A protein has these predicted regions:
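N-terminal "domain-start" segment that seeds a small globular fold
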Residues: 1-11
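A structural signal for the main folded, soluble domain(s) of proteins
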Residues: 9, 35-42, 54, 68, ...
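Local sequence-structure signature of Cys/Sec-based thiol-disulfide redox active-site neighborhoods
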Residues: 12-45
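Short cysteine/histidine-rich metal-coordination sites, predominantly Zn2+-binding motifs
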Residues: 44-49, 100-102
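Thiol-based oxidoreductase modules, predominantly thioredoxin-like and allied folds used
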Residues: 48-63
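Structural micro-motif
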Residues: 70-83
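Non-catalytic, surface beta->alpha helical segment in thiol-disulfide oxidoreductase systems
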Residues: 81-107
Length: 107
């Protein structure tokens, strides 16, 4: 799992990966902590898709860029599955789970 902080880094991830998962994580929210734990556990349990994340407090411009560019309302925590440069699926709060991530990746 790799931390991304800038728009340039994110654009490189999109160029380099046909599929990847991404998490917007708030370091001050307990629900976000639970989402981060589930996302991290899933990321470390599989090698099919690379996993990236950002800390909302440290990378607000990137978080806003993703919301605006991909037309996905910002939430935190928020997991996104990108495929071929588009958001194929996203979920927030308690809907982020290892099982749900696995289900979406398998589609």
């Amino acid at each position: 799992m790799q931390k991304i902080s800038t728009i340039e880094e994110f654009e490189q991830v999109v160029r380099d990966n046909s599929r990847f998962i991404f998490l917007k994580h708030s370091t001050t929210c307990p629900i976000s902590g639970a989402g981060y734990d589930a996302f991290s556990a899933f990321a470390s349990s599989q090698k099919e898709v690379p996993a990236y994340y950002l800390h909302v407090q440290e990378a607000r411009p990137l978080s806003n860029y993703i919301a605006e560019t991909y037309n996905v309302k910002h939430e935190s925590p928020q997991a996104l599955f990108f495929e071929e440069g588009k958001v194929k699926w996203h979920a927030s709060h308690w809907k982020i789970s290892e099982d749900e991530l696995a289900k979406q990746i398998a589609k």
